[in-house]
Design a protein with these regions (language model features):
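Sec-dependent signal peptide recognition
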Residues: 2-9
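C-terminal motif of bacterial Sec signal peptides marking the signal peptidase cleavage site
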Residues: 14-17
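Bacterial signal peptide processing site
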Residues: 19-21
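Post-signal peptide N-terminal segment of mature Sec-exported envelope proteins
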Residues: 24-41
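Short, Gly/Pro- and small/polar-rich lid/capping loops
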Residues: 36-53
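Active-site-surrounding "flap" and adjacent substrate/cofactor-binding loops of secreted or lumenal enzymes
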Residues: 41-44, 60-64, 68-133
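Noncatalytic, helix-rich "gating/capping" subdomain that lines the substrate-entry/channel surface
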Residues: 105-399, 403
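Intrinsically disordered, low-complexity linker/terminal regions across diverse proteins
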Residues: 277-280, 300-303, 365-369, 373-377, ...
Length: 578
């Protein structure tokens, strides 16, 4: 969840609550008991939980409340050169980051049993920090993949390589991603769609304003550099061809608003129909190399792009596609290759695209890699919550969730513009929200993964293979609603419409967002806003398309949907004036 997304929270709360007042939430948060020998714990920010040193009393809150509350902090702090933003999120993130580093380095110094989670965590980090070994290998770990790409002889080979790219951090114009079936929350399905761009969005290719023109020029330099690391012949010429190819893909890509529309992107079909209707591409080779040869029922996300994308695949010279695959393979693996490649990759991806002045120091990047969801994040998460997340915080958070839910219920019950038919469904959905607090009830079994202290590339590749194969198995076994899609040490939260779940990892439940020893009003104003934000996603323009069970269906009357849209449109118009 980003700062920008708080506007969505305020919009949803205003629309759902503009007709009635909100009762103060019941104060059910119990303070910690005092004993004769142990005084009550104090809040992180004394005396009652808010950092009053951040405010600027020279600003009248009625004129500029943000400036009044945060003005002094804003004047005294700058965005760090290795970051693109700054604020309380970064403060909490760095607190968790230091804790995770301590855990990792402690495990690295210990005599751990081979194959244990502790050994894997310590050795994965050690392999990342062994820069001398990484530099010694240079680009050589990628050579088998580059040789395979160079050996592509025809369209069938190309289709197979497109499918294989998901296992090697490469790229493909066709995506085949795992997703929960919008009509059945108990099963997964494969989504076929358009992808394959090296720049963030179609506008980066098609917009001729000065900024985007400069980015495209820098992109050409970047592609040339990456191909040069592989001693590619004519890298400048191929860079031009790759940019032209991706521009053609960008012209087919839907605009962002359509890509996030759950109705437009839900187009169920079958592989049999896909092969019959779009026979110019070897779907069997593509799916088999992706280990999806057994799949029949699928969803196409952007159906009108499939045929023109196939035409593009077949019309472009094979050598251009091979150069495209080679470039994305090198760039996609840049962070686990030599310092020279890594730095060159950051110079474009970090500096040009993200506006990040400096690369994060290596230990921070290593902590992020080891602790990632598709790294050893759950192994780390178990230790993190044992050390830093007491069960009492989970209990207190559940009380907060229930009180925010109660306030939301009052809002919905008091809406004069909503029909009883829609209100009944809305209240059912609200009551069915399933909160997950802190950490999973069961953890991912990582015992089959081999991690070596001197093989960074191999470690990353084996982890990628493990999680891709795990996704394939999910298609056969169905969903597990106890699964988490964030790690406990992540400072964030999310709402999952398919399962109607709101999820709050342990690391976000820290002061100033959540403080078990602060005045209850502080927690309602801080983490309460995050709780309300995630609940709000269940009733926003896309989340409201799912019912209490997480099934995608329209439970709104036409009049209620029109009323909701008119109110959110007015808020959007107001926002546009700022």
């Amino acid at each position: 969840m980003t700062l920008r997304n708080f506007f969505a929270l305020f919009a949803c709360l205003l629309v759902l609550g503009c007709d009635n007042e909100v009762s103060a939430p019941a104060d059910t948060t119990e303070s910690m008991a005092e004993t004769a020998t142990e005084p009550a714990a104090k809040p992180h920010y004394e005396p009652w939980g808010v950092d009053l040193g951040a405010n600027n009393p020279d600003i009248q809150p009625g004129d500029d409340f943000w400036g009044y509350a945060n003005g002094k902090w804003a004047d005294e702090n700058e965005i760090p050169p290795e970051r693109t933003s700054h604020g309380v999120w970064l403060e909490i993130h760095e607190r968790a980051e230091k804790r995770v580093r301590g855990i990792i380095e402690e495990l690295g110094d210990a005599d751990n049993e081979t194959g244990s989670s502790e050994q894997k965590v310590g050795d994965y980090y050690a392999s990342w920090m062994n820069v001398e070994k990484v530099d010694e290998l240079g680009i050589s770990p990628l050579q088998p993949d580059l040789d395979r790409i160079a050996a592509i002889e025809n369209a069938d080979d190309l289709a197979a390589e497109f499918g294989r790219q998901y296992f090697v951090y490469g790229s493909s114009p066709f995506s085949a991603g795992l997703g929960i079936n919008p009509k059945n929350p108990d099963e997964y399905m494969i989504n076929i769609g358009l992808t394959g761009l090296g720049l963030p969005d179609r506008d980066y290719y098609l917009d001729d304003t000065e900024r985007f023109i400069e980015i495209r020029q820098e992109y050409l330099i970047h592609i040339t550099q990456m191909l040069g690391f592989a001693n590619y012949r004519d890298p400048v010429e191929y860079a031009d061809s790759i940019l032209a190819l991706e521009t053609a893909i960008a012209e087919l890509q839907w605009i962002r608003a359509d890509r996030r529309d759950r109705d437009k992107t839900y187009n169920p079909t079958t592989v049999t129909a896909l092969k019959e209707q779009h026979s110019g591409f070897n779907w069997a080779a593509f799916l088999e190399s992706h280990r999806l040869e057994f799949v029949e029922n699928i969803i196409t996300n952007h159906p009108d792009t499939i045929e023109p994308l196939i035409a593009l695949v077949n019309e472009q010279p094979l050598d251009v596609w091979k150069a495209y695959l080679a470039y994305h393979l090198i760039s996609g693996n840049g962070s686990i290759l030599s310092t020279k490649i890594d730095d060159a990759n950051f110079a474009f991806v970090g500096k040009v695209l993200r506006g990040q002045e400096e690369q994060l120091v290596r230990w921070k990047r290593g902590v992020a890699r080891v602790g990632a969801q598709q790294g050893l994040g759950e192994a780390l998460g178990q230790i993190y919550v044992d050390r830093y997340f007491p069960e009492s915080s989970k209990t207190q958070m559940l009380e907060l969730v229930e009180n925010v839910r109660a306030a939301y219920k009052e809002r919905i019950q008091g809406l004069s513009w909503m029909s009883e038919e829609t209100r009944e469904e809305a209240l059912m959905k609200l009551a069915a929200f399933y909160p997950k607090i802190g950490y999973p009830n069961k953890w991912v079994d990582l015992s089959d993964i081999t991690i070596s202290e001197d093989d960074l590339f191999g470690n990353a590749r084996r982890l990628r293979e493990f999680f891709e194969n795990r996704d394939v198995e999910k298609l056969k076994t169905g969903t597990d609603k106890e699964e988490w899609f964030m790690m406990p040490q992540t400072v964030n939260a999310y709402y999952l419409p398919n399962w109607n779940q709101i999820v709050f990892p342990a690391a976000i439940l820290e002061a100033p967002f959540f403080d078990p020893n602060a005045d209850p009003a502080v927690n309602y104003g801080a983490i309460g806003a995050v709780i309300g934000h995630e609940m709000g996603h269940g009733f926003d323009d896309q989340g409201s398309k799912y019912d209490a069970r997480g099934v995608k269906r329209n439970w709104w009357t036409d009049a209620d949907r029109a009323n909701f849209s008119s109110r959110t449109d007015r808020l959007g118009e107001q926002f546009d004036t700022y």
